[in-house]
Structures are given as C-alpha cells and as structure tokens.
Amino acid sequence: MPRRKDIYMIIGIMGAMPDEVDQLCEKLENVTVEPYGGVEYHRGTLAGKQVVVCCAGMGKANAAATTQVLITRYGAEKIIFSGIAGNMTSKIGIGDVVIGKTVLYHDAQLDMICQNPPYLKAYAGDPALIAAAEKACAEAGVKALTGKIATGDLFVGDSETKAAIEAKCAPDCVEMEGAAVSQIAAKNDVPCVILRAMSDNADEDGHEVLVVKKFSIAEYVATATRIVAAMVEAL
C-alpha cells in the first residue's frame, strides 16, 4: 500500500505508556481519534504542524508495529519517540535526557538482523531531529546527552544484567522500544529520533524508584511535552 500523502508534512509522535503521550494529546487542535490495531491514533495540529500521536505499548513488537502503521496508514514523514529509560552512564543523572545518536538492540544477534533491509546493526538518529532536540532541551534547561541507546525486551533492574549489557555495547541508557522504532523508520527511509529521560539507574533500586514515584513521571511528561512541542514547531 503506498504511503498516504497530505499537503503538509505529517510528524508521528510516539510513547510506550499513556502517561508519556497524554499531555501532548491534550495540546492538539482539530483532533480526530482512530482506533486501529489496538492503538488509538490522535491526529491533529501542534504548533501549526500536522501530527499523529499514539501510545504504542511496551516492547519491541508493539513499537515496530505502531511505527509501520504511522508511516503506511498516516503518512508520517518524521518520527519522534519520547519516553523513560534506565541510566547506564555517569555523565548524566536521574531526570536528564539521552538523545539517540545511535540506537541498537542489546538482546539480538546483530550479524543476523543486518542481513535484511535496512542492512544495519545499529540505527542513526536523524541529524536534523537531533539538532532540534538538543536546541529544545537547552531552551528548556534540561541537561541532555546525545549518545547511544540500547533496546531489549526486558526491564533492566539488576547489576548483573546491567554489567552484561555494558560489556556488550556500552550504551548511555537502556530501554524497550527505541531500536525497533528506529529499525522500521530506517527500513522506510523515514527520519527518526529517540528521546529518553532517565528514570532509574538500571539496577536493583530501579523497580522501587518507579513504584514509589521517586522519579516523577508527571514531571518528566510535562518537560517532554514542552521539548517535543518545541521540536515540532522548529521543523
């Protein structure tokens, strides 16, 4: 099915959890909502640009499927994914942001995955989207690191798993969707960037940090909404 085209560029904006996209949905104007494949797609305008905002659900399969729907059904020509992640570096702390310059899987055999389109072991964030994210973070007063994001289908919450991932690919943070989004975007030649705020340190305290709300999802979401809205306005 050919990608649907509209008069103006359409930007796809994704999160894995409802909290990560709800505030953005509230900011949309001229909104229509379409349930499709178990996901609600909110189409409208943000900062005068046409966007489609959705909650993909957690994990690689959900992320990949939703990315393809955004591109094929809604004609998304740029993809922004925003969410939380486990910190893997001493360069930043809880609440700081990693902008994905490089995104890859930590739980996959990369030399096999790269035998199919887009023939890559790792996926590069789009330079223009990275620049827009860096500018938006700076203007919002948010400390940001442009670096490496690792993706796998597990919540990393113990030192042994964290050390194994560090030894394998030395990422700046670890999460569950970014590489899948980036792989499908690359396969379709669609520019993409992954933004992650650090919610925990990917160790034994990670689950407690999230459960007892030491890291405020609401606070991050408000900041992320400002960052994404500023990015959209700049595109």
Language model features: what each stretch is:
Residues 1-8:
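Short, Lys/Arg-enriched N-terminal segments with co-localized hydrophobic residues
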Residues 9-28, 50:
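Short, conserved "active-site rim" segments that organize catalytic pockets and cofactor/ligand binding
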Residues 8-10, 34-235:
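Glycine-rich phosphate- or other oxyanion-binding loops that anchor nucleotides, phosphorylated ligands
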